[in-house]
Amino acid sequence: MSRVAKNPVTVPAGVEVKFGTEALVIKGKNGELSFPLHSDVAIEFNDGKLTFVANNSSKQANAMSGTARALVSNMVKGVSEGFEKKLQLMGVGYRAQAQGKILNLSLGFSHPIVYEMPEGVSVQTPSQTEIVLTGSDKQVVGQVASEIRAFRAPEPYKGKGVRYVGEVVVMKEAKKK
């Protein structure tokens, strides 16, 4: 049995778990997420706890039970608390502005970048150099943050670009004459 799958997932109050024929549906105050059921993993719901057991003793079944537990745990946290990623713009003239589901970025190009948020992700800009992404699906929030960062990744000489808050950019030394 997977070491990750040994720990049950505690379902907090206000989160509803439903078993469908092909998917596990988790509903909470931040929305609804579904997880497709895998044939190698059995999921049981008792006393507010989800337990994951491999159906057979194969390596793949053990691995899938741990993977399923981790993904469902993230979904439970997402629909109850939500996930947040913060980005920071470093550089002269680099600005961000949120207008509903659209993020306008000025990153030193000859044109502004207009990024439309996917379903389930909201964006706020507390200041012109800060971006805060929130949503219930951890994977989608991380993917959006990664795509925004990829527009202008931090460069190693001056550190200009879009970075995660708390990210350490390793700086290089300039060429000496």
From Swiss-Prot:
The keyword Metal-binding does not apply. Part of the 50S ribosomal subunit. The keyword Cell membrane does not apply. GO terms for cellular component: cytosolic large ribosomal subunit. The lineage of its organism: Bacteria, Pseudomonadati, Pseudomonadota, Betaproteobacteria, Neisseriales. This protein binds to the 23S rRNA, and is important in its secondary structure. It is located near the subunit interface in the base of the L7/L12 stalk, and near the tRNA binding site of the peptidyltransferase center. Belongs to the universal ribosomal protein uL6 family. One of its GO terms (molecular function) is structural constituent of ribosome. This is Large ribosomal subunit protein uL6. NCBIfam families: L6_bact. It comes from the Bacteria. GO terms for biological process: cytoplasmic translation. Keywords: Ribonucleoprotein, Ribosomal protein, RNA-binding, rRNA-binding. Gene3D superfamilies: Ribosomal protein L6, alpha-beta domain (3.90.930.12).
